[in-house]
């Protein structure tokens, strides 16, 4: 049996070795080797989320929150903040399962659903919010250092903030590998600081500073809210909400993860759950052991509770630095993705990256300058509402993205499930190539980047599609070679064209089908039935006593059967491809994603924005409208997004119209194709027939032949 020589790429062996080589873990990589570094669930997503959630607000404002809202309402406020963040995380997970998230994180997620114009607007506001949040974290760190050193001057606080910002800028420019290594160390120190606070609440007292220990009377006194002058539930909520703004940090790491489809959901949900538990512990312990006056006016009351005060201060400093570093990591990469997609042409220079991980040096410098500008504001309580409004607007966009994507997918009509008959044989020469892919959150590692779009991958697909064997010449007996009649020679000349076509595509017509069950279930029913009937007839003919020359002509009935149902098959295949966009993977967190909960979260977040600071909300919406129309004028050719067919206002109108009896339902409209009766069309032949090439077969010539015309000849 002879084997056909396969077409190989020039360096296909090296490409195969690179594709099969697994990326090394980050701790095994050499420090000064220029190679991309990818991370996993716990060292990448979980660490980044926890570092961003455990910020200045936890260490400096938890006691102030308990002193104003009390223990009971404080727990409710913390749970409500975490719930708003959890709804957004689940919405992001739902979008990631139905769509794809690139290296742009939040921007890529919103842009793929709502379009580049909306995604660019929300992405720029999110970057701005990250810069303001970084300034808030650095300011909190500088305030603590200045109090520790006895420096009450505001310029001392600003000088310390600028120095810390420059140090973090250097770490970010060094690469993501150093950021993750530093984050692991900082997370360990934060755990030690939290343990020191919990142990200190049991081991000692400090009545002079309001730490009097556990007392039922004290806990009862601190249970109900008692606000300071000028404070309310929503002002406290506005100050405390930035504590949960780090939940989207895992989505911003999509380009630096080995398996983003599995790492982002698991790491983000684990970080949210552990953070909620630790926040509840802090609120309960502070309300049970400290007086209300100390909780209100002493921002460092938790430092008096700790067993070793310097460990708590170390955790405060580390949390401030880590949260700011997380903002300096995510914001430049979002800005880089916006620049690479040319959403705003003026920012195209920020799309360049250096190193194997494409570190956005220019974007890091720009975000650092914006952060430095807000450092000079110098007050945490002033910066916190600005951060809250920007992040709440981003959460509204993410929640609405998942809702619109779900509603758009529900509006699709389902494709009928294919029914396969037992014992039926199908095509062996064409397996289904629309294999279901896992949801992509960004980079899939170097393995896929090597294979995608290369000749090696094309050859692999062709090997799967066509069995590269020539069983026809070796398996069929050669009979009657010596006594050939003119009729057999004529029959051989007739099949020359079809035999050449068969050899060109290397069809193996006698091989049994090899469709996997899970792949065959996704093929259209009409296509399966047509192929079964065609190939069942051919199998029965090939097993009979037929001459050698008629075997190649069995391809003609197959082409005839397929040409009759080609229109219906094309429609079903196109509908199948359209519905593949909305297929969801099954996992334990898939059932937690609900579009109606996302819609409720979007509406609730929008209302909370107006209640906290309606002035900041109106300013943000005005800026968003200006940026939106500017992007529409500067880049009019941006994609519309996966949910462009869904309109919230049309959906609301369709719900409200049946309830309004006075309004008539819209009449059905039918669009008719224009008639072309006045246009005459005729076919002509460009080259005239002559005797110069009479002996040459007619290649590249097609004709439509009915089954009835062919049957008398065979």
From Swiss-Prot:
TM helices/strands, residue ranges? 37-60, 72-93, 99-116, 123-142, 154-173, 185-205, 233-254, 266-289, 309-331, 360-377, 383-403, 593-616, 622-643
What residues bear carbohydrate chains? 221
Return the GO cellular component terms, semicolon-separated. Answer: membrane
Record Pfam families: AA_permease
Task: Report any one BP term from Gene Ontology.
Answer: cell volume homeostasis
Q: Where does this polypeptide localize?
A: Membrane
Q: Tell whether Glycoprotein is among the UniProt keywords.
A: yes
Q: In which tissues has expression of this protein been reported? A: Ubiquitous with very low level in normal skin.
Keyword Cell cycle attributed: no
The segments labelled Disordered in the record are 471-503, 530-550
Where is it mostly found?
membrane
PANTHER family named in the record: SOLUTE CARRIER FAMILY 12 MEMBER 8, SOLUTE CARRIER FAMILY 12, CATION COTRANSPORTERS
* UniProt disease link: SLC12A8 has been identified as a possible susceptibility gene for psoriasis mapped to chromosome 3q21 (PSORS5).
Say which family it is in.
Belongs to the SLC12A transporter family.
Per its database record, what is this protein's job?
Cation/chloride cotransporter that may play a role in the control of keratinocyte proliferation.
Q: What is this protein called?
A: Solute carrier family 12 member 8
Source organism per UniProt: Homo sapiens
């Amino acid at each position: 049996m002879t084997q056909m020589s396969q077409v190989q790429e020039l360096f296909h062996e090296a490409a195969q070795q690179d594709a099969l080589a697994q990326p090394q873990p980050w701790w095994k990589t050499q420090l000064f080797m220029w190679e991309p570094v990818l991370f996993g669930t716990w060292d990448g997503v979980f660490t980044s989320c926890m570092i961003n959630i455990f910020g200045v607000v936890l260490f400096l404002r938890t006691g102030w929150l308990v002193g104003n809202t009390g223990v009971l309402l404080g727990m409710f406020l913390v749970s409500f903040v975490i719930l708003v963040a959890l709804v957004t995380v689940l919405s992001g997970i739902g979008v990631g399962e139905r769509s794809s998230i690139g290296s742009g994180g939040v921007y890529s997620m919103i842009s793929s659903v709502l379009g580049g114009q909306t995604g660019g607007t929300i992405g720029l506001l999110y970057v701005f919010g990250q810069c303001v949040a970084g300034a808030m974290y650095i300011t909190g760190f500088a305030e603590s250092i200045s109090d520790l050193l006895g420096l009450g001057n505001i310029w001392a606080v600003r000088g310390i903030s600028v120095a810390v910002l420059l140090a973090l800028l250097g770490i970010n420019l060094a690469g993501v590998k150093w950021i993750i290594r530093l984050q692991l160390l900082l997370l360990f120190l934060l755990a030690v600081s939290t343990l020191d606070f919990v142990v200190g609440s049991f081991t000692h007292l400090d009545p002079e500073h309001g730490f009097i220990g556990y007392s039922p009377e004290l806990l009862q006194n601190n249970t109900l809210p008692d606000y300071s002058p000028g404070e309310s539930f929503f002002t406290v909520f506005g100050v405390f909400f930035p504590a949960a703004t780090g939940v989207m940090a895992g989505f911003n790491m999509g380009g630096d993860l080995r398996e983003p489809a599995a790492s982002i959901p698991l790491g983000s949900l684990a970080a949210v759950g552990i953070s909620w538990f630790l926040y509840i512990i802090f609120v309960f312990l502070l309300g049970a052991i400290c007086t209300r006056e100390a909780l209100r006016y002493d921002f460092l009351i938790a430092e008096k509770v700790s067993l070793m005060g310097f460990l708590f201060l170390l955790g405060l400093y580390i949390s401030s630095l880590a949260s700011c570093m997380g903002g300096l990591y995510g914001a430049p990469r979002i800005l880089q993705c916006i620049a690479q997609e040319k959403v705003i042409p003026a920012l195209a220079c920020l799309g360049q990256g250096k190193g194997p991980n494409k570190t956005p040096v220019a974007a890091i410098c720009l975000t650092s300058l914006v952060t430095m500008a807000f450092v000079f504001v110098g007050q945490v309580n002033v910066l916190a509402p600005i951060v809250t409004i920007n992040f709440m607007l981003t959460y509204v966009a993410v929640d609405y993205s998942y809702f619109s994507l779900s509603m758009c997918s529900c509006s699709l009509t389902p494709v009928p499930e294919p029914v396969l008959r037992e014992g039926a044989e199908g095509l062996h020469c064409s397996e289904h190539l629309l294999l279901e892919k896992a949801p992509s959150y960004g980079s899939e590692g170097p393995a896929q980047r090597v294979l995608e779009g290369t000749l090696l991958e094309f050859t692999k697909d062709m090997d799967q599609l066509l069995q590269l064997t020539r069983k026809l010449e070796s398996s069929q007996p050669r009979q009657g070679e010596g006594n050939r009649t003119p009729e057999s020679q004529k029959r051989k000349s007739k099949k020359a064209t079809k035999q050449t076509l068969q050899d060109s595509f290397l069809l193996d017509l006698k091989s049994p089908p090899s469709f996997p069950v899970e792949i065959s279930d996704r093929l259209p029913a009409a296509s399966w039935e047509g192929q079964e009937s065609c190939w069942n007839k051919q199998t029965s003919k090939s097993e009979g006593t037929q001459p050698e020359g008629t075997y190649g002509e069995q391809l003609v009935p197959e082409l005839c059967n397929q040409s009759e149902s080609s229109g219906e098959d094309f429609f079903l295949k196109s509908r199948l491809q359209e519905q593949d966009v909305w297929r969801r993977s099954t996992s334990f967190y898939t059932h937690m994603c609900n579009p109606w909960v996302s819609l409720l979260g979007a509406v609730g977040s929008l209302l909370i924005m107006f209640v906290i600071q309606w002035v900041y909300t109106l300013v943000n919406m005005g800026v968003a409208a200006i940026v939106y129309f500017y992007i529409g004028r500067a880049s009019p050719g941006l994609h519309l997004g996966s949910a462009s067919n869904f309109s919230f206002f049309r959906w609301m109108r369709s719900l409200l119209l049946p309830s309004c009896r006075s309004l008539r339902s819209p009449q059905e409209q039918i669009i008719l194709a224009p008639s072309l009766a006045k246009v005459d069309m005729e076919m002509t032949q460009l080259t005239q027939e002559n005797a110069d090439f009479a002996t040459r077969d007619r290649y590249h010539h097609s004709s439509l032949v009915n089954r009835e015309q062919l049957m008398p000849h065979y």
